[in-house]
């Protein structure tokens, strides 16, 4: 334990890890979600988390080949984790607005829906849903 205290908070090994499952509203707490479902985001990616954290001024880097241990789906979409620096060399906070890992997760979940990639996807998806609803009129019960 003594050698763990000797390492600097600025080492990349000491950065906090954020997996997309922590912010996913499709996951239960048992499956790895760490924030309230009301604040969680639908299927966030590690790249989106990195973009949001980098935009606010945090020191981040993306590890694309890492996977969350509770994630059963092995698709490329679900891979990746983001490492975020919370503390500087002297132990003080990098940004005062992020005193804990939970504050970073809540901020990322709040900002991801505002990304341009998210707003463009939802705008096009609504039209396809409206067109598909008209074809369901012909279905009825089976006759015996």
Curated annotation (Swiss-Prot):
Residue segments, region Disordered: 117-144
Superkingdom as given in the UniProt entry: Eukaryota
GO biological process assignments: SRP-dependent cotranslational protein targeting to membrane, signal sequence recognition
A GO CC term assigned to this protein in UniProt: nucleolus
Compartments it resides in: Cytoplasm; Nucleus, Nucleolus; Nucleus, Nucleoplasm
InterPro entries, per the entry: Signal_recog_particle_SRP19, SRP19-like_sf
Entry keyword annotation includes Nucleus: yes
GO molecular function: 7S RNA binding; ribosome binding
Location (main, coarse): cytoplasm
The keyword NADP is assigned to this record: no
Keywords attached to this entry: Cytoplasm, Nucleus, Ribonucleoprotein, RNA-binding, Signal recognition particle
Similarity annotation: Belongs to the SRP19 family.
UniProt subunit comment: Component of a signal recognition particle complex that consists of a 7SL RNA molecule of 300 nucleotides and six protein subunits: SRP72, SRP68, SRP54, SRP19, SRP14 and SRP9. Interacts with IPO5, IPO7, IPO8, KPNB1 and TNPO1. Interactions with IPO8 and TNPO1 may be involved in SRP19 import into the nucleus.
Functional summary from the UniProt entry: Component of the signal recognition particle (SRP) complex, a ribonucleoprotein complex that mediates the cotranslational targeting of secretory and membrane proteins to the endoplasmic reticulum (ER). Binds directly to 7SL RNA. Mediates binding of SRP54 to the SRP complex.
Protein name in UniProt: Signal recognition particle 19 kDa protein
Organism: Bos taurus
Organism classification: Eukaryota, Metazoa, Chordata, Craniata, Vertebrata
């Amino acid at each position: 334990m003594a050698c763990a205290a000797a390492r600097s908070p600025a080492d990349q090994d000491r950065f906090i890890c954020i997996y997309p499952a922590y912010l996913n509203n499709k996951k239960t707490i048992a499956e790895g979600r760490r924030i309230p479902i009301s604040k969680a985001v639908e299927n966030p990616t590690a790249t989106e988390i990195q973009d949001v954290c980098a935009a606010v001024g945090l020191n981040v880097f993306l590890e694309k080949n890492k996977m969350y241990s509770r994630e059963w789906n092995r698709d490329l979409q679900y891979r990746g984790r983001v490492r975020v620096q919370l503390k500087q060399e002297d132990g003080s906070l990098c940004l005062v607005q992020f005193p804990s890992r939970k504050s970073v997760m809540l901020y990322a979940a709040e900002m991801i829906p505002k990304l341009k990639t998210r707003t463009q996807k939802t705008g096009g998806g609504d039209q396809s849903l409206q067109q598909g609803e008209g074809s369901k009129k012909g279905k009825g019960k089976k006759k015996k």
